Amino acid sequence: MLRIDLRGKRALVAGVADDAGFGFAIAKALVEAGASVCLGTWPPALGIFKTLLERGKIDASLALADGGKLAFERIYPLDAEFDSEDDVPKDVAESKRYRDHGDVSIAGLAARLVADFGEPCVDIVVHSLANGPEVKKPLLETSRRGYLAAVGVSAYSYASMVARFGPLTRPGGAFVALSYLAAERAVPGYGGGMSSAKAALESDTRLLAYEAGRKWGHRVNVISAGPLASRAASAIGVIERMIAHYKQHAPLPEELSAAEVGSVAAFLCSPLASGITGATIHVDKGYHAMGGPPVS
């Protein structure tokens, strides 16, 4: 039987802080396929997330198909706005939400993994990171600072992670990021430079696939997922309207589930996808294929 088999693999999923988003669903799918999973979580949300896990508040979401319970090998602090500890402003490093976490940068996360597991330490890296501080603003009203912040965290951080984790990933490793159709089409309401960030993310994926493939033999892909009513997506402000629009116009009118994206990510990280790199895979019930409204 042909199956996704990730036994013996270790994955890092960056950008998980609750049980409602794509990152959590991907982490769960990877565990279901046999991988061990470490998480990178935004420092201000880390304590709350660990408390939810420890107190059993999200136990229903942790249930696995085989009757077991989802467990993470490690949960590390990560703020993908910073490439190295030197990039973290002093006032941020000394703030209440950061001061007890040490080096929260991408390089700091890489160092923690090496300290815990040696080199090489991972097989799979998932980038489920995005932040647009001005996402509710139209592009015409977006500041330079807000625009660059969106691109830095949502797109450049993928290049930074591939650069830093590429040497720490076993040959034939897989990198996967998450994008959205606003990279290709105009989506009113998805502002603050986030559409530009997603376009950059998809463009970078193609070049990273070439560079990481030639340098280390790794594959680099991105999933363009449909809208999901996650806690993170609520920041957009029009997410429910976007979901309703997709259900009305997509070839498959059912609402997209996070688990469907998780399954595709697990496939892309597996040997079954060994010939796929530099690709943008749409998981959106076919909405991306449409050029007009339904006839009836």
Can you name each region flagged by the protein language model?
Residues 3-47:
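Canonical Rossmann dinucleotide-binding motif of NAD(H)/NADP(H)-dependent dehydrogenases/reductases
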Residues 7-10, 172, 252:
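Phosphate-coordination loops involved in phosphoryl transfer and adenosine-cofactor binding
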Residues 13, 126, 176-178, 220-223, ...:
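Hydrophobic structural elements of the Rossmann-like NAD(P)H-binding subdomain
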Residues 15-24, 42, 130-215, 224-230, ...:
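Catalytic loop of short-chain dehydrogenase/reductase
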Residues 30, 212, 268:
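Aromatic pocket-lining residues of Rossmann-like dinucleotide-binding sites
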Residues 50, 54, 192, 215, ...:
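A glycine/serine/threonine-rich, flexible loop-to-helix segment
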Residues 51-150, 167, 183, 189-190, ...:
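Conserved mid-core segment of classical short-chain dehydrogenase/reductases
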Residues 104-108, 156, 222, 240-276, ...:
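C-terminal helical subdomain
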